């Protein structure tokens, strides 16, 4: 009897765990819908009830009440028992106030909307991706493109959403990865595929003696100029960041003392990573280095789970995968770099630095580029923007 009861209790626990996994997509959609319908923006102004929110937002009263209750059940809202026909009132939880309200300094709303409109749709075709070993943009969003960024940038609105999502990511963890190593000895820093310039501006603030350049595609730089004005520092000064337009696989790369590749290599297969690293090494001055920012797998590749899931995102949306420290060391060594070091600051992303080295392995592809002196930026060559 004791064994039977133990087995039954274990089965019940396992079944609950199974159902939590099976229904996990529902929780994601509650979060995404709450952001898309600006539920958390409304609750930031004061307690809301379902009927009033439905009227002001053009929503169905029944659907609104069900969504608000689900948000409360997930800990996104707090539900206050109400008296009378208005029913309960809802307020934001601390999590929602910090990360889900559009005006919050640490808001992740754009990132979540990008995940909902692109990444989530690709994940609906995971079995196809595993069978075929390729991205699933054609099935998910109707864009069959060899370059994954053609699908991500399928409209100007999607481009801007992606750029904002990356900017939000760096608002949380950019400073930590930039401070993982002392970058002050590097006078000229180039952020390759530097997005809206958020990480580059952080580098300019942390290391005011350095000149920081963002190398980005022309269309992204144009979008940054129009939509991402640089924030002023406390003293009113704007962090100075220069921009160069080009394609980092084809265009000459500017000379620099340090290249930053933040969440870039995981987009690409090994051969493309080595090619890009060789180009970077050829543009580095003597004594230079490369700083890689990635979510690094544990030795043997058994975890963490979040990084394993992100690796599947690379299957569905790009050509690469997440890697272990040893795999990044092998890639950098093939490109001619030496002495890769790994730092694990608090947060989901890790910092690795490798020295330029003096041996063979580099093709000298550095040089000019189309320079534009601008205190704005473009969007990076990074696909799975999850935090």
From Swiss-Prot:
Residues 356-370 have a biased composition (Gly residues). S-adenosyl-L-methionine binds at residues 153, 170, 216, 246-248, 263. Transmembrane segments: none annotated. One of its GO terms (molecular function) is protein dimerization activity. Belongs to the class I-like SAM-binding methyltransferase superfamily. Cation-independent O-methyltransferase family. Catalyzes the transfer of a methyl group onto N-acetylserotonin, producing melatonin (N-acetyl-5-methoxytryptamine). Pineal melatonin synthesis is severely compromised in most inbred strains. In many inbred strains, genetic defects in ASMT have been identified. Melatonin production may have an impact on gonadal development, testis development being significantly promoted in melatonin-deficient C57BL/6J x Mus musculus molossinus animals. Homodimer. This is Acetylserotonin O-methyltransferase. The lineage of its organism: Eukaryota, Metazoa, Chordata, Craniata, Vertebrata.
